[in-house]
Every structure is written in structure tokens, then in C-alpha cells.
């Protein structure tokens, strides 16, 4: 037998009303927090695009536009794809088109690199970054191009620049978009002065912290509100023993 409380009908109605109110407030708060995160991300992208624009870079000196292939070394020939069944779990990140997809027990690169998505719907959808930096020991499959950039500042600059760019003109394939090597290496990129490079990268890092700090605190804030709801729910559903009935 399960014992359940049977409070007066008016008490039941009031409890339901209060719990519904809590549920509504929690949903509204989550929506507001998500909207704030989206607003911060949009703000970051606005300032990023401004800082990476030709006019902004030119305030610190001359800016040359060059093909990406002239300022990076392509290391795609060293990539090795591994089927899921062939991977042995380990400590080293295994990268694909959208970033880390697994961790394996070995590595094929041990250096600072810039990876760029080679294929996948995200090349058009852009819900995730298509360029991402790695450092240290990693494994990369054949769904991400591997680029070596001599300057760490320029690598970070190129990462941000490629993520801000509309890649449609450089893609092939309609159902499965692909950024092949020739398309990637032909992308025009700015080659600014060291001063402009350092200024842009440092400002972008500060702006990114503005977004990531808030994003990191978002799950904790939502969890705290849920815990608060559960606390009051449990209190509201606690009744004296005389109101409990066997059913």
C-alpha cells in the first residue's frame, strides 16, 4: 500500500497554484538567461567583425591581402582517420570536423596547430566554429584540415577571421558541403602589422571572456533555481500524519 496525503480541496488548489507559479518563473528565468547569452554572443560577433575588418586593421599600418596558402603550411598528409571500433580510449583528443569527437591512447601531432573543418553541414549552418586551435598532443582525422602557422598571434587571428567569414564561395557540393584544399588555401586573408595583430587578438580574448564567463555560470544558475523549486515543492507537499491516507 502507498500512503498519500489528502489535504482539503482548497489546500490542494493553492498548492497547485503556487507550484505552477514556480514552474512559470523558472521557465521565464531560463529563457531570460538564454536570451542574455545570445545577446552577448551577438555582441561579441559584432565587435569581432569590426576588429577584423580591413579599415580597423589599417589604423595601425598597411594591410596586405594574401591567399591563406601563402601564410600557412598544410599538414593534411599526416592525418589518419580511425573508425570508432579501431580507437582505443585514452587521454589524447581525437579531432574531426567539429572539434573533439573522442579521446584515444596515441597521437600524431605534438605542436600548435590550426584546424579547419573540411566537410559537413556546419560549413553552411555555422552553429559551431569551423576553425579551432589545438596545442600539444592530438590525433586528427581526415574531416579537418591541419594548418601550421608560425606566429601564435597570427594563428589566433586566422582562427577568428575564418570563423567570421562567409565560406559559401569556397565550398563545393550541395548535399554534403566540402571545403577542399584548393578552396581553403585560396581564401584571401589580411596580413596586418604586428601591432594590429596583437591589438586585435588581445581585445578579442577579453571580449570572449565576457561571453564564456557568463556561459560557464549559466548551468549553475539554472541548477540553483531548480533546487529552490524542489525545496519549496517538498515543503508544500509535506503534511501532518492525520492528512495521510492509505490507497
Set out the residue ranges of the language-model regions.
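Charged, alpha-helix-forming regions
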Residues: 1-247
Amino acid at each position: 500500500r502507498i500512503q498519500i496525503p489528502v489535504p482539503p480541496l482548497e489546500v490542494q488548489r493553492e498548492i497547485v497554484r503556487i507550484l505552477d507559479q514556480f514552474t512559470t518563473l523558472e521557465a521565464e528565468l531560463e529563457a531570460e538567461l538564454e536570451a542574455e547569452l545570445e545577446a552577448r554572443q551577438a555582441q561579441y560577433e559584432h565587435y569581432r567583425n569590426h576588429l577584423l575588418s580591413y579599415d580597423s586593421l589599417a589604423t595601425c599600418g598597411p594591410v596586405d591581402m594574401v591567399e591563406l596558402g601563402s601564410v600557412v603550411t598544410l599538414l593534411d598528409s599526416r592525418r589518419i582517420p580511425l573508425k570508432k571500433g579501431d580507437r582505443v580510449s585514452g587521454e589524447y583528443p581525437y579531432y574531426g570536423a567539429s572539434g573533439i569527437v573522442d579521446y584515444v591512447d596515441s597521437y600524431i601531432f605534438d605542436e600548435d596547430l590550426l584546424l579547419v573543418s573540411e566537410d559537413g553541414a556546419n560549413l553552411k549552418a555555422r552553429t559551431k566554429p569551423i576553425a579551432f586551435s589545438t596545442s600539444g598532443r592530438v590525433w586528427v582525422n581526415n574531416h579537418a584540415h591541419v594548418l601550421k602557422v608560425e606566429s601564435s598571434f597570427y594563428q589566433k587571428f586566422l582562427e577568428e577571421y575564418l570563423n567570421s567569414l562567409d565560406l559559401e564561395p569556397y565550398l563545393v557540393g550541395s548535399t554534403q558541403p566540402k571545403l577542399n584544399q584548393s578552396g581553403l588555401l585560396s581564401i584571401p586573408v589580411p596580413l596586418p602589422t604586428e601591432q594590429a595583430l596583437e591589438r586585435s587578438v588581445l581585445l578579442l580574448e577579453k571580449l570572449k571572456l565576457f561571453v564564456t564567463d557568463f556561459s560557464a555560470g549559466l548551468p549553475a544558475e539554472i541548477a540553483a533555481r531548480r533546487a529552490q523549486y524542489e525545496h519549496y515543492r517538498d515543503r508544500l507537499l509535506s503534511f501532518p500524519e492525520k492528512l495521510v491516507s492509505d490507497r
